[in-house]
Amino acid sequence: MKSALPKVLHRLAGKSLLQHVLDAAAGLGPAHTVVITGHGAAEVEAASAASGAVFVRQMPQLGTGHAVQQAVPALSKTHAVTLVLNGDVPLITTTTAAALVQSCSGDKLALLTVELPDATGYGRIVRGAGGGVQAIVEHKDATPALRAIREVYTGILAAPTALLARWVMALNNNNVQGEFYLTDVVAMAVADGVPVVAIAAPSDTEVLGVNSPVQLADLERRFQRQQAEALLEAGVRLADPARLDVRGRLHCGSDV
């Protein structure tokens, strides 16, 4: 981000990226929320203290699977499902998250996927002859044939807590990056005979991450366009929707 500010504290529509995610999660009424911090941990924890989340630190950062490993002690085995979200994917909605959680009922692993014209950097969804999900292969580990796949993993999943805890604690780092990949739990689920379901995101806007000022600006515009369209559909007259910036929640009467 070319900034001293931790990435998840950069703002979109006047609210930090992380707060957008926490608000979406709060809409599900979770038993509790665990936030895994790394770079700028103290600053992130201070900024989000009012959320009531439990904070655990990932030191050092050894991959997405390693991150979830740090949260395992804070996950009560009485919690039927664990939903994994990303602090830099701010526009995920409560509705989509709820659908994903519902999809993993009956001891399934549920993945949120999307098809992208340019899938660079994303893990590819590998399906078997019958169409079922068999694995996720990270971009850096993918062959040219696998990189041609456009269906990708968004980084968001839901799974029965006991199964997820067992899988992540069994991860290894035998890969190009020498990291513990959360995506490896898919192959573990398949090996255990646990069904893996892939739920398509309603739009790529919900699942795009922020890794640069350019991407942040793009999501800001997408978000504001969504707000403008919602207001127009509610009957609000906007002379130029492209020049609207909404902060917080806006309630309008008729003939505004």
Predicted features, each with a name:
Residues 34-35, 83-84, 109-112, 198:
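Structural beta-sheet core signal
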Residues 6-11, 57, 171-174:
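Short glycine-enriched, charge-decorated loop/helix-capping segments at active-site entrances
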Residues 1-4:
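N-terminal nucleotide-binding beta1-loop-alpha1 segment
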Residues 42, 92-176, 183, 194, ...:
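Conserved core of the sugar-phosphate nucleotidyltransferase
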Residues 177-256:
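Left-handed beta-helix
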